[in-house]
Amino acid sequence: MELTLHEARVIGCLLEKEVTTPEQYPLSLNALTLACNQKTSREPVLELTEAQVQDALDSLNKKRLISEQSGFGSRVVKYKHRFCNTEFSELQLSTAAVAIVCLLLLRGPQTPGELRTRSNRLHDFKDVLEVEACIKQLMERDKPVLTQLPREPGKRECRYTELFSQGSEQVSATSLSADSPSADSNSLNAQDRQQLEARVTQLEGQVAELKDKLESLIASLS
């Protein structure tokens, strides 16, 4: 399963609203667009048009990750996810796991502490240890759905990211690149040192030349 940024946002919103506002679920295109563009609890904040959300829905429908629903007497089409915990889904998750995956889809990589703080409307974790236990289970599945990122400089906790979206792959690649300097960067550093040494030698020569001229000037005046 590989989701684009827009698809991941749509799935995350459907997962979230199913739990937090069940009376409004499934969601219409308009309601889903508003959910995708929320200014809070979203990272990054997006400004998707209804057309962009519809494109994401069409793509997810082809992947059989969402379904459409029309009520009697209503022409408004509403959408619900088939991402997990349905008879059509291979992915079966606990409510705790759904909360963690949902938050990672909506807000990107996070620490266990951040996940516990932000999950209160989705699941009531007793403490960070419970979050960490759930994360461990998700990482030890036959098909892991989470991965741990290298610890950031100056931070005590590692962050975790989901493995469903393209964004998570980019984050992982960036983290690994930052954690392990490449041969190209080492080569560039060596080149910079050579240029710096050449510049220093040039400046030393200019200083010596100016010193000689100054001494000659002083000698001519005395």
From Swiss-Prot:
Q: Name the Pfam families on file.
A: DUF480
Region (Disordered) residue spans = 169-195
Matching InterPro entries:
DUF480, WH-like_DNA-bd_sf, WH_DNA-bd_sf
Question: What domain of life is recorded for the organism?
Answer: Bacteria
Question: Where are the compositionally biased (Polar residues) regions?
Answer: 169-193
Q: What family does the database annotate? A: Belongs to the UPF0502 family.
HAMAP family listed in its UniProt record: UPF0502
Q: Which PANTHER family match?
A: UPF0502 PROTEIN YCEH
The protein, known as: UPF0502 protein SO_1867
Annotated source species: Shewanella oneidensis (strain ATCC 700550 / JCM 31522 / CIP 106686 / LMG 19005 / NCIMB 14063 / MR-1)
